[in-house]
Amino acid sequence: MALRKKVVCLLAMAMALLMLCGTAMADNFSFLPSRTENGKEYLAHPSSELTTILLIGYDHYANGQIEEEPSQYHLGGQSDFLLLLVIDHKNQQIHQLQFDRDTMTPIKLVATNGKDAGTRRLQLCLAHAYGRTREENNRNTIWAVEKLLGIEKADDGAEIDYYISMDISGINKLNELVGGVTVTIPNDDLLALDPTLKGGETIKLTGMQAEYFTRTRYDTAEPTNEARMARQRIYLNSLETLLEEKIRANVNYVNTLLNEMGMIFDRTTTLDSGFGFTTDDATGTAITDTTDHYLMANVSIDNLALLANRVMDYEVLDVETLNGVHSLGSDEHIHFDLYENEALNWTLKTFYTEADGN
């Protein structure tokens, strides 16, 4: 599948759980040093060979209920959807890694005065909650993902080049804009919410059905994030096919879709900036003329189009996940603990090559 379609799609998952449409400048500035693991030396791929994009889908629900009065520095909502794209220009491949929102990992905290309050091992999804602005929420999420994968710099600079975040309350709008997405319902988990969402049935999702299918975890027969992640991948695959058809029919369709969803350009999150928290006002600039802005990115729409062209014929690899164990923590919330070296092994195979002679 060509990539203006697939990345947009991929990035449409981002709108399905996000929405992207390509991206990756001709040059990026991320840098990883060589490293030694288990007596073997690994060399990082040159920065010119890789472009990384984090897709963040977040909402403002807690245990199925919207947070009516979040604290001043806890405004971001939790990131229920996280997908990292690693674009390998040398091998012309796109790696995809989807994270379980309940993955336990260090995240940055913010005190009531807005200052950095250190780190704590919590669910990955909570990283997005801390901060007063959307920019801060996204920067904190980037840092947490980098920390989990072991690719962060000592000075908190970015190894992840770009991000696109979406308030996933916009999923119904996205679904409506594309004319509805057809999926095969995998099981009867959602019957209590909508009797038409019966396992084995193939239907076009309309209205609230898209939200039920992609966002619901509580009040289902299988209330785990793993089950929801599986439904999200089903939705993405169908959305990819639909977008491919629409893009082939109209090359400007992606720009139209992005404009309808509304996007804010984050000018503050660059590869040269520190990721510490500040109390500065947000400096995001709306770059679409819509009333609502469901999307934020630290890359412009014009540059989003550049990569789509550059990677048009790249191979898009299957979505990967990290393995681990779910359990009920002492805080009465689900914890997902990765197996030992699970994240490290993915990082080594994706960002590094083993040095000759080892």
Residue positions per predicted region:
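Non-catalytic, solvent-exposed segments at the cell envelope interface
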Residues: 25-358
